[in-house]
Regions:
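Long, highly hydrophobic alpha-helical transmembrane signal-anchor segments
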Residues: 1-7, 61-91
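Alpha-helical transmembrane spans of integral membrane proteins, capturing the lipid-embedded, hydrophobic core
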Residues: 7, 11, 15, 64, ...
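Short membrane-interface loop/juxtamembrane segments of multi-pass integral membrane proteins
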Residues: 40-55, 125-140
Length: 171
């Protein structure tokens, strides 16, 4: 029951956070959008001074590193609260939370809300909607890569929790 509440709360918190960030700054997730859109935005008058450029995969990873560290810490706490007693249970709990939030963001927030809310799109790019904003394959195509990141984060989070459990039980 605790795990279900954690999943729901995490989905709501991260969903609301993403909606607020996108409403505040439509170019917030530009590095995750199709390259064609990134190129157009780079040359638009209002965005030239924002240092928007096409990032390499390594640069995208480095940009996401603080978020991954946050998630690792959060999953250590959440799996402990949910009552994970073994490495395998903790891993399943952590991965379940990660995947639930990932799927909620990609399918509900991006495919459901963002793809159908033109007023939050980058002004001047509406003509590219079919190939960018409403391209569900783009959003769904990001799921496997992010799921792999989730597996790594879950292993790190649960390894730490598991080591701490052994350390405290030995003393």
């Amino acid at each position: 029951m605790v795990l279900a509440v954690e999943v729901i709360v995490c989905c709501l918190i991260f969903g609301i956070y993403r909606v607020i960030r996108i409403k505040r700054d439509p170019a917030y997730k530009i590095s995750n959008m199709p390259e064609k859109l990134q190129k157009k935005v780079m040359h638009m008058r209002g965005y030239r001074n924002r240092n928007i450029r096409i990032m390499t995969d390594w640069e995208k990873f480095v940009k996401k590193l603080p978020t991954l560290i946050f998630w690792t810490i959060a999953l250590v706490i959440l799996t402990s609260i949910a009552g994970a007693k073994s490495f395998s249970t903790g891993f399943v709990f952590a991965l379940l939370i990660w995947m639930a939030v990932l799927l909620f963001l990609e399918l509900v927030v991006y495919c459901g809300w963002y793809a159908h809310t033109p007023k939050v799109w980058i002004k001047g790019t509406e003509d590219m909607a079919k190939k960018t904003y409403t391209n569900y394959a783009h959003y769904i195509g990001l799921i496997p890569q992010r799921a792999l990141m989730g597996i790594v984060v879950a292993i790190i989070a649960v390894s730490y929790t598991h080591l701490r459990a052994h350390e405290t039980s030995l003393h």
